[in-house]
Amino acid sequence: MAKATTIKIKLLSTADTGFFYVTTKNSRTMTDKMTKTKYDPVAKKHVEFKETKIK
């Protein structure tokens, strides 16, 4: 079997609320760490989310 190209990642809020999203990314085309601006319902505003490992 071939190695999967899509992997699951965790996007953790930079507002230190502990809120996170789980999404997928293509590990072959996106080799750097992913950052996205998304809504954090704990902070009640849009903040930047950075990629971390799923434990």
Swiss-Prot record:
GO cellular component: cytosolic large ribosomal subunit
Pfam families: Ribosomal_L33
Keywords: Ribonucleoprotein, Ribosomal protein
Entries under SUPFAM superfamilies matching the protein: Zn-binding ribosomal proteins
InterPro entries for the chain: Ribosomal_bL33, Ribosomal_bL33_CS, Ribosomal_bL33_sf, Ribosomal_zn-bd
GO biological process: translation
GO terms for MF: structural constituent of ribosome
Gene3D superfamilies assigned to the protein according to its UniProt record, in alphabetical order: Ribosomal protein L33
Domain of life: Bacteria
Tagged with keyword Nucleus: no
Record-linked PANTHER family: 54S RIBOSOMAL PROTEIN L39, MITOCHONDRIAL, LARGE RIBOSOMAL SUBUNIT PROTEIN BL33M
Family to which the UniProt record says this protein belongs: Belongs to the bacterial ribosomal protein bL33 family.
Name of this chain's protein: Large ribosomal subunit protein bL33
